[in-house]
């Protein structure tokens, strides 16, 4: 706790002194200070909140001679304001009144009960149902010379309790953060590690929090183990330092221990198929290139019935396992679900899953003692539904090991269910303060207090009847209001009949209101009973939460099984609805896809042309040529997506598919300027290409699209040619290489492992029809002018382009315009790659033939046809005069 000098409080009121002490402990955090029905912010916090939340900034009095600037939000709407602030990367300390105003002699006692930060969200109102929120800490490991040798990462999903560790090379940080996507990143004070822009809100914490020995011990204490050997984390010293800082920070924000963080997963990069940031972006796994959530592979696959399944799907897509065993187990389960008997049909199973609550997040809130009444009723109803759910899958578990494992994990925790059933009302109120949360019959004292409150009406009816009979006042009434409580009302004309034990409580224009000793006694009992019932209910609810804590591991087990079952059922539904098949796997090098389809594009169009893709030891690179908009990029992406889906465990959009080992997927598709990093489009392209050339292995799948753009034609051609040869000669990876440099189609003559394929188009009238079919051999042209015409480029521009194209093609073979080279001339005989003959340029097409290709005879008038004939003769004579055959 921060200690302030007495001078800091001089002249401040006691309440402001209390606030300043609290604020001193949270200097970089907005403090929501509870005052009655509002959370107030003061001074700089008020100014900042008013700006961020569009609140009214007020000024009320002064403290120590300084005007008190204030802004506030109503307590019942605080969650919507918290959601806005954490989305902006802000943290908020919630300061509640914990003392009783009636007994406080000075300011009501207050303390910070929790700190809401971007990475520590657990409230349902602050969380996205289908996205996990991660808090990540990073700790750099150095050698004896002070050189960074690794970066230890620890990240926690506080809502579920999932904790993971990893150690990576320093240059892998951007890829790791892109995969994890933390909402908040903790780094040591003074650290120089550069966090990529947009990676998450950054928070500096004291460097001693990252002490490796302390972190290791804190991690052991958290997991209740003597050693981390059983988790495979004993050698991850940097990651243990990061974990120590992470656990310390997370516990401090919650103001309590993290009871649900009881296990640890160590992630190794060799465990999953590598996907760098460019690949995740270009394949549009969970986000489109435009930044929208659909249409993506995730949006297509996500037909999950629970939010737990949806979140697990996102995790699986970003973590495809390299070992095919996991994928085969999942696909076996999908097959069993598709072949299930009528009493365990897929539709019936999914219908049952729709009734399941978010057990994972409810368990997290339960562990933090922040679960609300309807969380507990939802947990109860879910556990009650588990036996029927297990009956549905019981008939098919013998056909799938994954389903058998899920079935065993779905055994409901009986004691937990009994407690929830007996303690929680069938339909509880949203908040404990509203009452009606604890079930009748659970506590005798509460039942008695409720009876007093609930039987109030009958007592008043009986009292009114007795008093009318006793006094003879026929219109006497017994009533209640919040200001005066219970009273007996008598009209003016009947007051002479009032008995002596009536005491006047209020005089009205036409009536008098009285209280009697009997009514006063009842009033005291009834009003106190309601307050006592609410207090008793609060105490009972807290005791129920405490009693449920031992069941957290069982709740987590059930949540994990439900998420996996839901996702497997969603995969089965997609396979059935979209006509997908189970892929097969082999240990041999190769990829065989028969009639593959792009899963996302197919869902957006009426008809999709399926295509084959084949790789093997004798076929490692496909040179893809064809027209713009012909489908080259779609074909490339669909190959990568089908491979990824297969290893994730889904069925795939193809007639058949077989995959050998795949360790990484690389893409170099499209690019844009990196303005923030000061890199041009070409520089971005070359950086991505360099990563592929340096890291791709014979088991990597590489997508290269239009490499060499953004510089001069010959520089680009030379680079594309050299990169393609390097991928063949050195990387020997599976490569899809799309290009408009037709000169590269000669590469298979030098490298038999390369093959030409093309996508065709045919001209029809003035237009062009794309066939989208992949055929063997190179394309004959790219139809760039026709595509420009389709895009709406004005006709005069198209005609001018055609003429200039003919001129350029005529000149290109006879002369070469000097250009500024990216490279100096290479020295003689460096190696076989640099000394290899460059591809020869093809013969220039005859200009007369080019002219004829652009003619539609049906559109020519007789005079135009004659003029065209003379023009063609002139082109032929001119061409011959220049020495062409």
From Swiss-Prot:
Which terms under GO biological process does the entry name?
mismatch repair
State the SMART domains in the record. Answer: MUTSac, MUTSd
* Key words, A-Z: ATP-binding, DNA damage, DNA repair, DNA-binding, Nucleotide-binding
Q: Which GO terms describe its cellular component?
A: cytosol
Q: For this protein, what is any one GO molecular function term?
A: damaged DNA binding
Report the InterPro entries cross-referenced here: DNA_mismatch_repair_MutS, DNA_mismatch_repair_MutS-lik_N, DNA_mismatch_repair_MutS/MSH, DNA_mismatch_repair_MutS_C, DNA_mismatch_repair_MutS_clamp, DNA_mismatch_repair_MutS_core, DNA_mismatch_repair_MutS_N, DNA_mismatch_repair_MutS_sf
The residues that hold ATP are 626-633
Q: Does the keyword Transit peptide apply?
A: no
Listed transmembrane segments: none
Q: Does the keyword DNA damage apply?
A: yes
Write out the similarity annotation: Belongs to the DNA mismatch repair MutS family.
What function does this protein fulfil?
Answer: This protein is involved in the repair of mismatches in DNA. It is possible that it carries out the mismatch recognition step. This protein has a weak ATPase activity.
Designated name of the protein:
DNA mismatch repair protein MutS
Organism expressing this protein natively: Burkholderia cenocepacia (strain HI2424)
Lineage of the source organism? Bacteria, Pseudomonadati, Pseudomonadota, Betaproteobacteria, Burkholderiales
């Amino acid at each position: 706790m921060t200690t302030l000098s007495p001078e800091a409080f001089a002249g401040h009121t006691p309440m402001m002194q209390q606030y300043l002490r609290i604020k001193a402990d949270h200097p970089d955090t907005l403090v929501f200070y509870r005052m009655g029905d509002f959370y107030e912010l003061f001074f700089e916090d008020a100014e900042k909140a008013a700006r961020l939340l569009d609140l009214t900034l007020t000024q009320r009095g002064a403290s120590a001679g300084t005007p008190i600037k204030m802004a506030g939000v109503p307590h019942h709407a605080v969650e919507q304001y918290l959601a806005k602030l954490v989305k902006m990367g802000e943290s908020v300390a919630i300061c509640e009144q914990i003392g009783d105003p009636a007994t406080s002699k000075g300011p009501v006692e207050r303390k910070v009960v929790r700190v809401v930060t971007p990475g520590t969200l657990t409230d349902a109102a602050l969380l996205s149902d289908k996205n996990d929120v991660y808090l990540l800490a990073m700790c750099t490991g150095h050698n004896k010379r002070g050189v960074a040798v690794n970066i230890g990462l620890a990240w926690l999903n506080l809502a579920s309790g999932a904790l993971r560790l990893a150690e990576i090379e320093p240059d892998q940080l951007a890829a790791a953060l892109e995969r994890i996507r933390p909402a908040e990143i903790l780094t040591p004070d003074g650290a120089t590690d550069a966090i990529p822009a947009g990676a998450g809100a950054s928070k500096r914490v004291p460097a001693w929090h990252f002490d490796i020995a302390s972190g290791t011990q804190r991690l052991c204490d958290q997991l209740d183990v003597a050693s981390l050997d059983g988790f495979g984390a004993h050698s991850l010293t940097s990651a243990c330092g990061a974990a120590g800082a992470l656990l310390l920070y997370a516990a401090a924000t919650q103001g309590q221990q993290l009871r649900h963080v009881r296990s640890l997963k160590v992630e190794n990069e060799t465990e999953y198929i590598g996907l760098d940031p460019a690949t995740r972006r270009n394949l549009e796994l969970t986000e489109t290139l435009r930044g929208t959530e659909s249409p993506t592979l995730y949006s297509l696959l996500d037909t999950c019935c629970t939010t737990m399944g949806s979140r697990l799907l996102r995790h699986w897509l970003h973590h495809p396992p390299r070992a095919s065993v996991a994928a085969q187990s999942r696909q076996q389960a999908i097959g069993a679900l598709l072949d299930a008997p009528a009493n365990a049909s897929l539709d019936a199973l999914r219908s049952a899953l729709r009734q399941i609550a978010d057990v994972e997040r409810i368990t997290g809130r339960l562990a933090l003692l922040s679960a609300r009444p309807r969380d507990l009723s939802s947990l109860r109803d879910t556990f009650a539904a588990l036996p029927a759910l297990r009956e549905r899958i019981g008939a098919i578990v013998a056909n799938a090991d994954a389903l058998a494992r899920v079935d065993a994990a779905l055994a409901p925790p009986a004691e937990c269910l009994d407690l929830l059933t007996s303690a929680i009302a069938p339909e509880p109120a949203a908040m404990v303060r509203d009452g009606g949360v604890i079930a009748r019959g659970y506590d005798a004292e509460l039942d008695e207090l409720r009876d007093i409150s609930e039987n109030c009406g009958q007592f008043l009816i009986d009292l009114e009847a007795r008093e009318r009979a006793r006094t003879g006042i026929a219109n006497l009434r017994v009533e209640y209001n919040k200001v005066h409580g219970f009273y007996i009302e008598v009209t003016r004309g009947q007051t002479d009949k009032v008995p002596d034990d009536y005491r006047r409580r209020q005089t009205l224009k036409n009536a008098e209101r009285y209280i009697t000793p009997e009514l006063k006694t009842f009033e005291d009992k009834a009003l106190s009973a309601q307050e006592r019932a609410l207090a008793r209910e609060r105490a009972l609810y807290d005791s129920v939460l405490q009693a449920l804590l031992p069941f957290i591991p069982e709740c987590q087990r059930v949540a994990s099984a439900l998420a996996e079952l839901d996702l497997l059922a969603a995969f089965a539904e997609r396979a059935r609805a979209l006509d997908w098949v189970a892929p097969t796997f082999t240990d041999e090098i190769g990829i065989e896809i028969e009639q593959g389809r792009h899963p996302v594009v197919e869902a957006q169009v009426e008809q999709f042309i399926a295509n084959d893709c084949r790789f093997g030891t004798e076929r490692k690179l496909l040179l893809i040529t064809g027209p713009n908009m012909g489908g080259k990029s779609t074909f490339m992406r669909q190959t990568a997506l089908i491979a990824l889906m297969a290893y994730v465990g889904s069925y795939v959009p193809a007639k058949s598919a077989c995959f050998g080992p795949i360790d990484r997927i690389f893409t170099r598709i499209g690019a844009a300027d990196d303005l923030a990093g000061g890199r041009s489009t070409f520089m971005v392209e070359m950086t991505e290409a360099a990563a592929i050339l340096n890291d791709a292995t014979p088991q990597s799948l590489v997508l290269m699209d239009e490499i060499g753009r953004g510089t001069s034609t010959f520089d680009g051609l030379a680079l594309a040619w050299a990169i393609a040869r390097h991928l063949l000669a050195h990387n020997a990876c599976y490569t899809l290489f799309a290009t408009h440099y037709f000169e590269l189609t000669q590469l298979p003559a030098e490298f038999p492992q390369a093959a030409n394929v093309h996508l065709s188009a045919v001209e029809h009238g003035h237009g062009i029809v794309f066939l989208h079919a992949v055929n063997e051999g190179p394309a004959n042209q790219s139809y760039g002018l026709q595509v420009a015409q389709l895009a709406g480029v004005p006709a005069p521009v198209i005609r001018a382009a055609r003429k200039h194209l003919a001129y350029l093609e005529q000149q290109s073979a006879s002369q070469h315009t000097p250009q500024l080279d990216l490279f100096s001339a290479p020295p003689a005989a460096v190696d076989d790659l640099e000394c290899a003959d460059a591809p020869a340029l093809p013969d220039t097409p005859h200009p007369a033939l080019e002219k004829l290709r652009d003619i539609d005879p049906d559109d020519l008038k007789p005079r135009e046809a004659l003029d065209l004939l003379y023009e063609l003769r002139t082109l032929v004579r001119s061409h011959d005069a220049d020495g062409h055959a």
